[in-house]
A protein has these predicted regions:
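Iron-sulfur cluster-binding electron-transfer modules in prokaryotic oxidoreductases
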Residues: 10-398
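Short acidic/histidine-rich active-site segments
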Residues: 5-6
Length: 398
């Protein structure tokens, strides 16, 4: 809840981390270092390699350890009664904390850019339906961010697919880019500022190169990116433009489901909510074609928190699980026995919510992915990649 005297403890924490780093007091954490490396690098081969290690092997190994720990009854008591953190936890305790909820599975094997062959950082990808004229197609600039592009690439692809469906011309940044927020919040303000400045210069070059396109909307699919991109002064890059979450944009375009049989939804609003123009519950309910209740509380993933401080993450998840179970009970109060899905609009939250599946039986998904599944069909991803790679991508030299 907000501080009664309006102190932003997020800003205070970032300032403290920067101070500790400058004084040489910041402790090294392997999980944080690995995550920052994955988010910062731009070379496609390195991204592919780290993605393979992290997802194909790392996530799979964590899932096997979770099953082993559960079979040996090492994790049940800790999850049911998470101990308070009063001192530095023992290594054994932290390992159990790290494996007590399974990582998500069935993630796409390749990043969104790799699937579309647009990894070259000297080329600006412009994606549009070739059947539409320039006058019929509104140009938007989509900044996918790390979570929607490198990790949960189905989110970035679903965003592009829905933009394609509503007739938008989608301009993507050249190459893999991070917004700079993770570095800033991790205590490396200088690195975060350098990334922000480099990106702004790059986007000015994009705007000059594509000055024949009248870009009036910048789209994001991540709340953390939204918070950072609000500092980019996009109105100076694309004059008269606005910054919108993909779900807000789709709501404006009249996209909605006509009621999904056998499924009911809850909405988890991220701590870094990306929806700044419209109320998140209004957007979610409009898009899903039915009233969607809010499921409160932090999911406990919080970027790298679940890796760097799994003990605290376990405590946060304990309270979130209570909220999920309460929400499920309310949705089933009238005897409904169909599927319950919890929707979100943050890549980190998608990972965090997916980890409750064995305990609550709920499936977690992104709103835009759920829209793509129902409006474009179960095979929407392969269909979109095929359409995009067959004459829908213009590669403009930067």
């Amino acid at each position: 809840k907000p501080c009664p005297v309006d102190i932003d403890f997020g800003d205070v924490t970032i300032a403290m981390r920067n101070l500790l780093r400058k004084q040489g007091k910041q402790k090294f954490n392997l999980g944080t270092a690995a995550a920052m490396t994955f988010l910062t690098i731009k070379d496609p081969m390195f991204i592919k390699g780290i993605r393979e290690v992290m997802i194909r092997f790392g996530y799979a190994a964590q899932n096997k350890l979770y099953k082993l720990g559960k079979s040996l009854h090492l994790i049940q008591d800790q999850v049911a009664h998470p101990p308070a953190t009063v001192h530095k936890p023992a290594v054994r305790t932290q390992i159990i904390n790290f494996i007590n909820k399974p990582m998500p599975g069935n993630l796409p094997k390749r990043s969104a850019r790799a699937l579309l062959d647009i990894e070259d950082d000297k080329v600006i990808p412009v994606i549009r339906n070739p059947k539409l004229s320039a006058e019929e197609s509104e140009a938007v600039f989509y900044f996918p961010g790390c979570g929607s592009e490198r990790l949960f690439s189905q989110v970035g692809l679903a965003t592009q697919a829905m933009l394609y469906e509503v007739g938008a011309t989608t301009v993507l940044p050249p190459g893999y880019l991070c917004c700079g927020y993770p570095q800033t919040s991790g205590g490396h303000e200088d690195k975060g500022q350098r990334i922000t400045t480099d990106n702004r210069v790059l986007f000015h070059r994009v705007a000059n190169t594509l000055n024949y396109l009248d870009i009036k909307t910048v789209i994001v699919s991540c709340g953390t990116c939204m918070d950072q991109l609000q500092k980019y002064q996009f109105e100076r890059i694309f004059p008269g433009c606005r910054l919108l979450d993909i779900h807000e944009y789709l709501m404006e375009k009249g996209v909605k489901l006509e009621g999904v049989e056998g499924t009911r939804y809850m909405y988890h609003d991220p701590c870094h909510t990306p929806m700044k123009t419209y109320a998140p519950l209004k957007v979610t309910s409009e898009l899903m074609g039915t009233k969607v209740p809010l499921n409160d509380r932090c999911c406990g993933e919080s970027g790298t928190l679940a890796v760097t401080r799994p003990d605290i993450s376990t405590q946060v998840r304990f309270r979130k699980q209570e909220e999920l179970e309460k929400g499920t009970s309310e949705l089933r109060a009238d005897g409904f026995n169909g599927q319950i899905k919890v929707l979100t609009s943050c890549p980190s939250c998608l990972q965090g919510l997916s980890r409750f599946r064995d305990d609550t039986g709920e499936e977690a998904d992104y709103i835009v992915v759920e829209l793509a599944k129902h409006l474009l069909g179960d095979n929407w991803m392969a269909d979109y990649v095929s359409r995009a790679n067959t004459g829908s991508i213009e590669r403009v030299l930067l």
